[in-house]
């Protein structure tokens, strides 16, 4: 039963050394930015009851969840989403409203094989609870733009869409749930030919304003001109209000000087059914992968308690790291300046010397070897030019000059030795 002991499960991988450090740095910079903007931290368990995700419309496919049983036979899942557990917390432990929260953690979804998607990813995000007006969406977009700027991510854009517009259109069409899922796929993928065929097959009236808007929806992406085009075809007040909200958000963010970071895509339709209004997606041009996703979900928290308006977005940390690795100089570990070799009875003195050298800006580290020659070999291999030996009665500094030679030798006190 040891066939797989040397392998990783499908869709997972190990993160080593520099890449692991970069993931941590990205998480911490995002965290600091969000905390500076007044968000408070929340952490939820990595495991949740299956029932947390099994409500009406089932926003996450059951097949995508990692499921197992607890000691009482209840179904447990590895969290496939961060927003739903946060909605559970807010709905069951309501605090002061409005509330701005931030989080970071791993999310697990079983993707199909050979899709190139990982089943375990790191997400950092923000949620604003209790605000209905556009200030919530604007705050979310500004927060993520500033966070990406501080990470020095280049060439990114945040697309603003409106799922409410799509839902208004679908309500007027004589189609069932399965056909709606198909329609959503065509629009999201901007498959113009398939959408046109769908309209013909369902015998939808192309002279009707709603059908004309539906057919144009995948093409309505860019700047404010697409909003004006959509407004001309909007056949209800609900549609017009949905479009006007996108326009107001775009214009406000543009006035702040962030116009180059945003665009509009009215054909963007999120696959998660809990979104009810404005939605977001962020991309980096070079990698073409989604780095930000989110939107308004005014009905989600009601599944766990009182109905409350909410907006949020998640940053895909792994994709940010991938982009930074491609856009910037490779991350390099800080070079070790001095290795300190010590006898066990001199560990305290060696540690004091290391601390003194660190305060002087030198990266000094204790050797893990018991033999001085092994320390010399390690230093040579890692291009460390100085080794200090903490012997029983003295401290000896060696430097590399085609061979290891004694630079100085002195008192047992690390302070006196360092000053010489």
UniProtKB/Swiss-Prot annotation:
Record GO terms (molecular function):
catalytic activity, acting on a protein; histidine-tRNA ligase activity; transferase activity
What InterPro entries does the annotation carry? aa-tRNA-synth_II, aa-tRNA-synth_II/BPL/LPL, HisRS-like_core, HisRS/HisZ, HisZ
Other comment: This function is generally fulfilled by the C-terminal part of HisG, which is missing in some bacteria such as this one.
Q: In which pathway does it act?
A: Amino-acid biosynthesis; L-histidine biosynthesis; L-histidine from 5-phospho-alpha-D-ribose 1-diphosphate: step 1/9
Q: Which organism is it from?
A: Bacillus mycoides (strain KBAB4)
Q: Can you say what this protein is called?
A: ATP phosphoribosyltransferase regulatory subunit
Q: Kindly state the subunit structure of this protein.
A: Heteromultimer composed of HisG and HisZ subunits.
Keyword list (alphabetical) reads:
Amino-acid biosynthesis, Cytoplasm, Histidine biosynthesis
Q: Primary place of residence?
A: cytoplasm
Q: What family is it from?
A: Belongs to the class-II aminoacyl-tRNA synthetase family. HisZ subfamily.
Q: What subcellular locations does the record give?
A: Cytoplasm
Instruction: List the CDD domains hit by this protein, alphabetically.
Output: HisRS-like_core
Mention one GO biological process in which this protein takes part, according to its record.
histidyl-tRNA aminoacylation
- Gene Ontology terms, cellular component aspect? cytoplasm
Does the UniProt entry include the keyword Glycoprotein? no
């Amino acid at each position: 039963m040891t066939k797989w002991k040397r392998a990783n499960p499908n869709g997972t991988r190990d993160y080593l050394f520099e890449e692991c450090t970069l993931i941590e740095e990205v998480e911490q910079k995002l965290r600091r930015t969000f905390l500076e903007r007044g968000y408070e931290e929340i952490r939820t368990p990595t495991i949740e009851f299956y029932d947390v995700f099994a409500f009406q419309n089932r926003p996450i496919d059951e097949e995508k969840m990692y499921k197992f049983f607890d000691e009482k036979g209840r179904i447990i899942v590895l969290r496939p989403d961060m927003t739903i557990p946060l909605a559970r917390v807010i709905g069951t432990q309501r605090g002061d409203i409005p509330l701005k929260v931030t989080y970071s953690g791993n999310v697990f979804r079983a993707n199909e094989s050979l899709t190139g998607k990982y089943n375990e990813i790191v997400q950092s995000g923000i949620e604003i609870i209790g605000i209905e007006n556009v200030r919530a969406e604007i705050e979310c977009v500004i927060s993520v733009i500033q966070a990406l700027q501080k990470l020095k991510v280049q060439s990114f854009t945040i697309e603003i869409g409106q799922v409410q517009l799509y839902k208004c259109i679908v309500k007027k069409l004589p189609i069932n749930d399965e056909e709606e899922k198909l329609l959503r796929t065509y629009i999201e993928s901007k498959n113009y030919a398939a959408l046109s065929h769908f309209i013909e097959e369902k015998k939808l009236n192309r002279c009707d304003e709603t059908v004309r808007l539906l057919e144009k929806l995948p093409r309505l992406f860019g700047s404010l001109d697409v909003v004006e085009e959509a407004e001309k075809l909007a056949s209800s007040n609900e549609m017009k209000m949905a479009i006007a909200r996108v326009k107001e958000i775009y214009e406000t963010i543009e006035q702040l000087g962030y116009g180059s970071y945003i665009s509009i895509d009215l054909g963007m339709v999120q696959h998660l059914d809990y979104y009810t209004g404005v939605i977001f997606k962020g991309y980096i041009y070079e990698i073409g992968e989604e780095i930000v996703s989110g939107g308004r979900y005014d009905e989600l928290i009601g599944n766990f308690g009182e109905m409350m308006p909410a907006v949020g977005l998640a940053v895909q940390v792994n994709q940010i790291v991938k982009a930074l690795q491609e856009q910037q100089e490779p991350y390099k570990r800080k070079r070790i300046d001095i290795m300190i070799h010590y006898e066990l009875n001199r560990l305290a003195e060696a540690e004091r010397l290391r601390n003194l050298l660190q305060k002087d800006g030198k990266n000094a580290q204790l050797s893990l070897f018991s033999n001085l020659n092994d320390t010399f070999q390690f230093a040579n291999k890692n291009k460390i030019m100085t080794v200090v030996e903490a012997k029983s009665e003295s401290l000896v500094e060696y430097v590399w000059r085609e061979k290891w030679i004694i630079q100085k030798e002195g008192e047992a006190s690390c302070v006196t030795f360092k000053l010489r």
